[in-house]
């Protein structure tokens, strides 16, 4: 049975997740490395849980928010997004949308590829997260401008 966007991904491949989080951190201009992202994250059998994916993303200066709609309804302004296959393999980054196709970044050295919407919805029907940079606001700086 396929997972819906509102279901939990459970676990995913730690190598694929970290590769994609590193790419996204660099995409948003943040310096990050695998050691920094993993820090004290428990890894069992090469898998990482959903809660730990959120922690690793925060260490890389990223904010993940779960998509409440399917990939077909994603707008170009909502990208990038991190999508998972139901079996929890390597996630895929949806970088840009062009009509019914997406420019996608694959984990590892496989690079980017253009995928049609039909292929995406068939292969990556698991959960999806919209990715944004974390914004740090220092309230002390506000005092200097008053």
Annotate each predicted stretch with a short phrase.
Residues 1-66:
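Cysteine-nucleophile protease catalytic domains, especially the papain-like/related folds used
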Residues 1-2, 18, 41-48, 54, ...:
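Noncatalytic regulatory segments and standalone regulatory/sensor domains
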Residues 65-69, 102:
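Membrane-cytosol interface segments
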């Amino acid at each position: 049975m396929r997972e819906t966007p509102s279901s939990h991904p459970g676990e995913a491949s730690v190598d694929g997740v970290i590769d994609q989080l590193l790419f996204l951190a660099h995409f948003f201009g943040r310096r990050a490395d695998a050691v920094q992202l993993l820090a004290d994250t428990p890894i069992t059998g090469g898998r990482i849980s959903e809660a730990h994916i959120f922690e690793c993303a925060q260490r890389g200066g990223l904010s993940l928010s779960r998509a409440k709609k399917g990939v077909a309804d994603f707008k170009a302004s909502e990208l990038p997004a991190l999508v998972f296959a139901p079996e929890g393999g390597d996630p895929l980054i949806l970088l840009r949308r062009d009509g019914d196709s997406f420019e996608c970044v694959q984990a590892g050295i496989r690079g980017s590829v253009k995928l049609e919407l039909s292929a995406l919805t068939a292969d990556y029907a698991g959960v999806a997260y919209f990715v944004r940079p974390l914004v740090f606001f220092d309230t002390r700086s506000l005092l200097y401008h008053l």
